[in-house]
């Protein structure tokens, strides 16, 4: 796990989610020192944002495919 301020763009949604779940478990169990927990929390925020971005991209792609498949489809606004 790297604690850089940026996250590799090529990390998959599944890998990011798995790492985020591991971070949450460690923090919840108190398995890290305060400093490490803060660093892990920072990494967790980056992972969460990355996962949200990937989900939004997937949703937009599905909407685009749906529009192309049937031009009469009406898409409802969804919260991201």
UniProtKB/Swiss-Prot annotation:
- Pfam families referenced in this protein's UniProt entry, alphabetically: Exonuc_VII_S
Got a GO cellular component term for this one? Answer: cytosol
Q: Which UniProt keywords apply?
A: Cytoplasm, Exonuclease, Hydrolase, Nuclease
Which locations, inside or outside the cell, does it occupy?
A: Cytoplasm
Q: What is its EC number?
A: 3.1.11.6
Per its UniProt record, what InterPro entries does this chain match?
A: Exonuc_VII_S, Exonuc_VII_ssu_sf
Q: Where are the membrane-spanning stretches?
A: none
UniProt keyword Hydrolase, yes or no: yes
MF term (GO), any: exodeoxyribonuclease VII activity
> What catalytic activity does the UniProt entry give for this protein?
Exonucleolytic cleavage in either 5'- to 3'- or 3'- to 5'-direction to yield nucleoside 5'-phosphates
Any one GO biological process = DNA catabolic process
Its job:
Bidirectionally degrades single-stranded DNA into large acid-insoluble oligonucleotides, which are then degraded further into small acid-soluble oligonucleotides.
What family is reported? Answer: Belongs to the XseB family.
NCBIfam families from the UniProt entry = PRK00977.1-4, xseB
Kindly state the subunit structure of this protein. Heterooligomer composed of large and small subunits.
Which protein is depicted?
Exodeoxyribonuclease 7 small subunit
